[in-house]
């Protein structure tokens, strides 16, 4: 899209993207270790899109948070497999989220959770980005559109997260995709800060790209899954859980081992030390606890994770703000919720997060 057309549509949408000329010259690196925030799921799946809400940016800023990740499905602006037609109306709503982030001091990270040719969640994409050149070309095109659209927005305010939780893929194949997508972005926006999820669902780093500047690698904070995803149908299906809910604890003894804060620390250090030794940087793009885990257990587990992230100097984003992992409208049956602007607020969880800002 030509620049004049974009500026016209952005103005009609009531959104003025922030232009910071000095940022184009400076090499100031964002303090990613200080990022604290949430994932916003408004365009996480197709079929149920929900416009971003300015008041949520206001609330996050008032509570002290400074980061949001936007996990997006490209099916919201393109039809499956039709990579070169992008709905301007949806893109304008993403424009508004970027602008609200700047306005309220919240860094915005755009993530293609469902990208052309890849999604960790079902249903499968019609093409495979690791095998089909057409899908890779389409994904590169869509990132080029975002790069061009926001090329004058500082990396202090905006970053790109290429794909979500790459799994069952060889490191060399992932490297090839990363280099292609980074190249597509940097051809338009040479200094854009880019986040890449680690291999194996964000469980370990991609160690073959230390030459790429301004790259952050993203981990996860979901272990052990028995705690974070207790009775989550997309993880365990309809299988009975190995531990009854009323017997679930943190720390936890299960599978013949002991899980506690030390386990969380050792797991993260073991996974990410090789990247840190290269001078790489780590951000926890997702962590959180599903609403079927008893609330007291969830809080104890979250507290230990937050303490580990603080010890390691890592920023984090809770999955999610609103929803079964979040602080708003989480649907837990063992929480005394507080009415908050028509939402049900888990004040205890919010306070725990605020203690770790």
Segments and roles (model prediction):
Residues 5-25:
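N-terminal export signals
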Residues 133, 137-258, 269-290, 311-314:
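Active-site region of glycoside hydrolase catalytic domains
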Residues 262-264:
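Alpha-helical scaffold elements lining the catalytic groove of polysaccharide deacetylases
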Residues 294-357:
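Aromatic-rich peripheral "rim/lid" segments of glycoside hydrolase catalytic domains that contact
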């Amino acid at each position: 899209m030509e620049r004049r057309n974009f500026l016209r549509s952005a103005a009609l949408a009531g959104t003025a993207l922030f232009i910071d000329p000095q940022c184009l010259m400076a090499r100031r690196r964002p303090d990613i270790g200080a990022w604290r925030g949430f994932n916003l799921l408004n365009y996480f799946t197709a079929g149920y899109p929900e416009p971003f809400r300015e008041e949520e940016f206001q609330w996050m800023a008032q509570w002290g948070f400074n980061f949001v990740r936007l996990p997006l499905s490209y099916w919201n602006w393109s039809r499956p497999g039709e990579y070169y037609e992008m709905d301007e109306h949806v893109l304008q709503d993403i424009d508004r989220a970027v602008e609200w982030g700047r306005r309220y001091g919240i860094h915005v990270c755009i993530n293609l959770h469902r990208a052309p040719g890849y999604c960790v969640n079902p249903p499968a994409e019609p093409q495979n980005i690791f095998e089909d050149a057409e899908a890779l070309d389409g994904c590169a095109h869509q990132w080029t559109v975002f790069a061009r659209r926001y090329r004058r927005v500082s990396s202090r305010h905006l970053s790109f997260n290429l794909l979500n939780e790459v799994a069952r893929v060889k490191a060399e194949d992932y490297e090839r995709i990363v280099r292609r997508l980074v190249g597509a972005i940097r051809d338009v926006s040479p200094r854009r800060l880019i986040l890449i999820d680690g291999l194996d669902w964000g469980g370990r780093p991609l160690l073959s790209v230390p030459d790429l500047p301004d790259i952050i690698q993203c981990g996860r904070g979901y272990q052990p899954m028995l705690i974070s995803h207790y009775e989550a149908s997309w993880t365990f299906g309809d299988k009975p859980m190995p531990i009854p809910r009323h017997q679930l604890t943190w720390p936890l003894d299960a599978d013949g081992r002991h899980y506690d804060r030390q386990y969380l620390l050792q797991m993260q250090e073991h996974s990410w030390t090789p990247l840190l030794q290269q001078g790489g940087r780590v951000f926890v793009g997702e962590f959180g606890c599903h609403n079927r885990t008893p609330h007291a257990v969830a809080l104890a587990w979250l507290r230990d994770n937050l303490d580990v992230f603080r010890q390691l100097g890592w920023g984090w984003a809770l999955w999610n703000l609103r929803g079964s992992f979040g602080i708003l409208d989480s649907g837990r049956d063992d929480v005394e919720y507080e009415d908050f602007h028509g939402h049900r607020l888990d004040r205890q969880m919010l306070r725990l997060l605020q203690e770790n800002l």
